[in-house]
Design a protein with these regions (language model features):
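N-terminal binding-site loop/beta-alpha segment at the start of enzyme catalytic domains
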Residues: 1-86, 123, 162
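Conserved, mostly hydrophobic/aromatic
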Residues: 6, 18, 47, 69, ...
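Active-site mouth loops of central-metabolism enzymes
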Residues: 21-30, 97-107, 148-151
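Short, acidic/polar
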Residues: 28-39, 105-118, 189
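Aromatic/hydrophobic pocket-lining residues that form the small-molecule binding cavity
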Residues: 32, 65, 109, 113, ...
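Surface-exposed, active-site-proximal loop segments in enzymatic domains
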Residues: 60, 90-103, 136-145
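Beta/alpha (TIM)-barrel catalytic core signal, keyed to glycine-rich beta->alpha loops juxtaposed to Asp/Glu
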Residues: 133-328
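Conserved small/polar residues in nucleotide/adenosyl-binding loops
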Residues: 333-339
């Protein structure tokens, strides 16, 4: 297993991180336990969770993914073998079951970390991340930016001050951001530098062959500021496995179960996926192998977060990271570039 430094810390994390957002919804706790056992056996010791998981977020299942991990820690005693990441939810009018509607203020962050620590059955988090911004900006695939400063809500300096307090208390070892913009990332970095607060060590954003916006602006920040990308959705909600080619939606698949996961459910995405499928086939690879290998070979990527709903998927995904794409294959992905008009 290949490992990379988490930002400017002395923590080595694997190029593969274990995503957990299906545990408690598409996967049972027992299946989550099996995935954690197997991941560790393969050297994958970086687990990424969130207080709102599993997805889609519901009051009935809120926090269940963290509970699954916490019970596994209690059963196995392997907390110290894992670099554990979780997230505090940003502002959302649709999640009133979370503290009446989550915010990134000091009191909300305090309640969030206390809840996560209890559910995870641990006394510290290795990486605590802001799941999405408080302010009115673009994330989760939103296009067409509109500027509404009056709707910004809790300012970044207040959020970072609260996070820094958790670091000072030892409840959190490092902090990161997620679903952020170049401006947001630089604001966190500026405030940390000016006020002597903890610096963000990672940014967890979407990155895959169908969604490469990170390369514009954020990739340079990641490399110059040592804030590596934790790439989520490297298979684009499973679209880049090829299983949806031809408009098929297999029973039990994410796109069949949940209509809200429609970011890549379009004719353009289908055409791009089909083109990538042919490139992979020409080079003796599965589409999954090529898609994952492409992401992890980017110099700005620290770790690629993979999730699976069954063990065969997990094995295939981990195996894919043993593949190194030749320059010719990478060049073909750039030359084809069916993503120019995509998400």
């Amino acid at each position: 297993m290949q490992y990379r430094k988490l930002g400017n810390t002395n923590i080595d994390i694997p190029i593969i991180g274990l995503g957990t957002m299906t545990w408690g919804q598409q996967n049972s706790f027992e299946e989550g336990y099996e995935q954690m056992d197997y991941a560790l056996s393969r050297g994958v010791n970086f687990f990424d969770a969130a207080e709102m998981y599993p997805v889609p977020p519901r009051a009935e299942t809120y926090g269940d993914t963290e509970r699954c991990i916490g019970k596994w820690f209690a059963q196995t005693g392997r907390r110290d073998d894992v670099t554990l990441a979780t997230k505090v939810s940003g502002r959302s009018k649709d999640m009133t079951h979370v503290r009446g509607g989550p915010r990134l203020s000091r009191d909300h962050i305090r309640k969030a970390i206390e809840g996560s620590l209890e559910r995870l059955q641990t006394d510290y988090i290795d990486l605590y991340q802001v799941h999405w911004p408080e302010r009115a900006t673009n994330f989760f695939g939103k296009r067409g930016y509109s500027h509404y400063p009056a709707a910004d809500g809790v300012a970044i300096d207040q959020t970072l001050d609260a996070l820094n307090e958790l670091v000072d208390e030892g409840l959190v070892k490092n902090i990161g951001i997620s679903n952020e913009t170049p401006w947001g990332a630089m604001e966190y970095l500026r405030l940390a530098s000016e006020r002597g607060w903890s610096k963000i060590v990672s940014i967890q954003n979407v990155y895959n062959l169908l969604s490469r916006q990170f390369e514009v602006g954020l990739a340079e920040i990641a490399l110059r500021e040592d804030v590596g990308l934790l790439a989520y959705s490297p298979l684009a909600f499973g679209v880049l496995t090829g299983k949806y080619i031809g408009g098929v939606k297999p029973k039990g698949s994410r796109l069949a179960l949940f209509e809200r996961f429609s970011r890549y459910d379009s004719l353009q995405s289908e055409a791009a996926t089909a083109a990538y499928f042919e490139i992979a086939k020409e080079h003796g690879l599965s589409l999954t192998q090529m898609s994952l290998a492409f992401v992890c070979q980017q110099p700005f990527v620290t770790s690629c977060l993979i999730g699976a709903t069954d063990m065969n998927q997990l094995r295939e995904n981990i195996d894919a990271f043993e593949i190194k794409l030749p320059k010719e294959t990478v060049s073909y992905t750039h030359l084809t570039l069916p993503t120019r008009k995509l998400v």
